[in-house]
Amino acid sequence: NVKKQIRNLGVCCESFTGDISNYNTAMEMFDEVHRHFGNVDILVNNAGISIIGLFQDMTRDEWDRIMNVNVGSVYNCCHFAIPDMINAKSGRIINISSVWGNAGASCEAAYSATKGAVNSLTKALAKELAPSGICVNAIACGAIDTDMNSFLSDEDKLSLFEEIPAGRMGRPDEAGKLAVMLADAPSYLTGQIITLDGAWI
């Protein structure tokens, strides 16, 4: 459905379904990207899951799963995209992170840890890749109205709105617009964790 909507806008679009935390699946996806579009110019790492609950109640399998999806997928995609960017001496990597990557969240310890890792990787890669003309930045999202937050009741949302100075949750299109801005930002803007949270944290 999304692919159809994009194509209706006159934009060339392909879709790929798979577990991006799996290295071989990621390799297959980038093979498809190269076949349809050629080299990778812009990479947005947006795969992510969350597990809500006490740290002591989390199983090792749950810990490994969230680490593989939230951090492993970033490794996989960067690993396959960066060679194209180095060859072109240009490129943009945009990692979708969270305010919890800096602040940490009770009952979301693993999620917070993964986003902290993404933030550190963003800064490290920015330094490593800047000589090759590649910019690496992250968007630290606050409460965004997506399926990940669909578990919140109406009462929970009202309480949350009271905490956020903007008085609402962010919209997915606002995160998307910021990603588009970063994709075309000045090349001197790199290594930054840009917060999108309505002045919440």
Give residue spans per PLM region.
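Substrate-binding pocket helix/loop in short-chain dehydrogenase/reductase
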Residues: 54-55, 62-64, 160
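Active-site loop immediately N-terminal to the catalytic Tyr-X3-Lys motif
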Residues: 55-56, 103-109, 131-132, 167
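Active-site helix of classical SDR
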Residues: 78, 114, 122
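Alpha-helical segment proximal to the catalytic Tyr-Lys
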Residues: 83, 127-131
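Residue(s) in the substrate-gating loop at a strand-loop-helix junction
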Residues: 98
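C-terminal helical subdomain
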Residues: 138, 162-189, 196-198
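Short, small/polar-rich loop/turn modules that mediate ligand/substrate recognition or access, typified
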Residues: 130, 135, 189-191
